[in-house]
Amino acid sequence: MGEDTFRFLSRNAAAPVVSRPPPNRVVAGDPVFTTWNAEERGNLYCGMWQCTPGKWRIQYEEWEYCRIVEGLSVITEDGGAARIVRAGDSFVIRPGFRGTWEVLETTLKDYVVAT
């Protein structure tokens, strides 16, 4: 029992990893990602992710559940409607999703990814 069977998600749960989207995917700005990957079990990952303002192309090969904790973003599927996501919103992005993610206000999300 204990830490092996229960874990809080927080920015203190893991060492932060700072990265950026590949330059060829950046549409606007200079988005910087900070990821706290709290758990990795086989094909499952969970933690927290934060991004500064910017816009880049996304292409999902994995399934992801997200809950926006802070900030404001717009996710637009190629050929589809723009979806505004803000603190309190939860959603799933499925494999095959292609489009853009635009961070208007620094955004923090909880995530669970299955590859």
Residue ranges and their predicted role:
Residues C46-M48, Y65, S90:
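Conserved hydrophobic/aromatic beta-strand scaffold that supports enzyme active sites
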Residues M1-N43:
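A short, N-terminal "cap"/entry segment at the start of jelly-roll beta-barrel domains
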Residues V92, G99, E105-T115:
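A short hydrophobic beta-strand segment most commonly corresponding to one strand
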Residues T52, A81, F97, T106-T107:
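A generic "binding-loop/recognition-motif" signal
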Residues C51, Y60-I75:
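Short, conserved beta-strand element in jelly-roll/cupin
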Residues E40-Y60, R94-P95:
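Conserved short histidine dyad/triad with adjacent acidic residue
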Residues G79-P95:
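Short acidic-glycine-tyrosine-enriched beta hairpin
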